[in-house]
């Protein structure tokens, strides 16, 4: 049995930094809906092929279920960095797992955790990613098996699970792991969760930002929503600006093509700087010196497009290529929490 050949890795106590696997951030491996999904995901881009299949009894593993894999990756990387031995066979309490991913610890939350483990185990993935030869495929489930542990007196001791070798190898490779913002676990929408992971994956490589064709994003997400609905939901995310650490924009090219762009958010600063007096000091204008300065994000048209994203993963970017000539006009909008700032 596989279990007998593996050493047990007990989850580390205390707080560890959340880490995510870049392959899972860049490609459509999970359902973005909270409703049960049975329809498979089929994705191809260059030499990358992915097929995700669900069992009718449980449905496809969701992007919320993937939080368990983020927990596992975080534990393994932290232990490895501390010089401890790790293993694909992991043990932890439901409390440790649930609190790490920002969930409650009620009986209902525990039952949801077990349902998530069932979906992760029953979802089947076939992919060409990180295969040594062209045309080869690797099939696995996100969890090979899991079980509840109990003592001799029947007292529950926690959970054990076995990770697939494909995922474990990615986690053990520093080049394939990124630290993510803990605020990610507070994102409630499936699309915004997927978008944060995609943006975080590319944001670490190009500090000047990134831009995507909306239809390309639609294909890349694996979403079952029609393109029109998908674009509407993206615009709503741009309006709300929920992604920790990043600002989102829509850009409209001269030909009418709509792009989604992002940039790293500026470092937070104090919104009010005391003047050392009890009263508001006039600034020479109708407003006070406490007024928020005009935003650097312009709502009006800009000329010229950004430089193409050539230095990063071309398979994840449908816009890579030679720069456009002629300097066509490009309109840029950022609709966020401070809509109308500086107007």
Explain the meaning of each model-derived region:
Residues 1-342:
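Charged, alpha-helix-forming regions
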